[in-house]
């Protein structure tokens, strides 16, 4: 397989892992405070990431990379987890998940601004069409819409797109898993003490589903998923592979339906087919 194909495969695996993030977060915030969930998942992942960096004896990033790593940390370690956790206090995960379809545009825009990519104009047409399909589906599907919850989700998309694009640019120099690992380690001096500060008064009231969800978002959403995702973006291009994010809402909706028993209508099938067509077309015109 060539480099581009490998990029799409790695990106797809990353999307599958990320698809479980919002359903897991929805379960977690039923028992955990959003602030504790955010800092604790980052602290757990940061400790593990630091261990990996030591075991594999990775060199420290150059000083010129520190600002970019802080941008990644702001976007994907702190901003996105916190904003989505806050949003899921106001809307269902099924409603929140469809906003993830707007991530490709945010990632592509920041890829142009920060990564120097220049996709063809037709790419933007299909990218916008796919995102509009997802946004339209979100409005039609409803599911407990809240203006505040929607605002949190939109803000999370912006900061996450920035973090994705910045991380993909860095991964070409530092390596894919090294980027998120260093971002987590840089966040650790803040996240670790805050996780103790926001620790629940009593753990007896915390259910097993919430604990398992905390483990999932800490290990998979914060670390393992990014290993595949950043590798995919670096190999296949930020704008091109980023379009796979359009599929994430529909994998997530399936999980929300199965795990959380949230209602998902049959209109999902038609929208999913249309979005996949947009992904295929955007891929063709990405470069």
UniProtKB/Swiss-Prot annotation:
- What is the membrane topology here? Multi-pass membrane protein
| Name of the protein in its database record | Uncharacterized transporter YdeK
Question: Where mainly found?
Answer: membrane
Q: InterPro entries recorded for this chain?
A: AA-Vitamin_Transporters (IPR050638), EamA_dom (IPR000620)
- Return the similarity comment: Belongs to the EamA transporter family.
Which UniProt key words apply to this protein? Answer: Cell membrane, Membrane, Repeat, Transmembrane, Transmembrane helix, Transport
Compartment(s) where it occurs, according to its Swiss-Prot or TrEMBL record: Cell membrane
Which spans are transmembrane here? Answer: 4-24, 36-56, 66-86, 93-113, 122-142, 148-168, 179-199, 208-228, 237-259, 264-286
Q: Which organism is it from?
A: Bacillus subtilis (strain 168)
